[in-house]
Amino acid sequence: MKLFYKAGACSLSPHIVLRELGLDFTAXKVD
């Protein structure tokens, strides 16, 4: 799974959920 995020956006919550569930994901920063 890929998690696309932008600095300063509200993408922290999904990141926390993915980590807590132990799911594998790749975080990809977008401009």
UniProtKB/Swiss-Prot annotation:
The keyword Transferase is annotated on this UniProt entry: yes
Enzyme Commission designation: 2.5.1.18
Reactions performed catalytically: RX + glutathione = an S-substituted glutathione + a halide anion + H(+)
Gene Ontology molecular function: glutathione transferase activity
Gene Ontology CC terms, in alphabetical order: cytoplasm
Highest taxon listed in the record's lineage: Bacteria
UniProt: glutathione binding residues: 10
Signal peptide (UniProt feature, chain positions): none
Alphabetically ordered keywords of this record: Cytoplasm, Transferase
Localization of this protein: Cytoplasm
Record-stated family: Belongs to the GST superfamily. Beta family.
Quaternary data: Homodimer.
Function: Conjugation of reduced glutathione to a wide number of exogenous and endogenous hydrophobic electrophiles.
The name this protein goes by in its record: Glutathione S-transferase GST-7.3
Native source species: Serratia marcescens
Lineage: Bacteria, Pseudomonadati, Pseudomonadota, Gammaproteobacteria, Enterobacterales
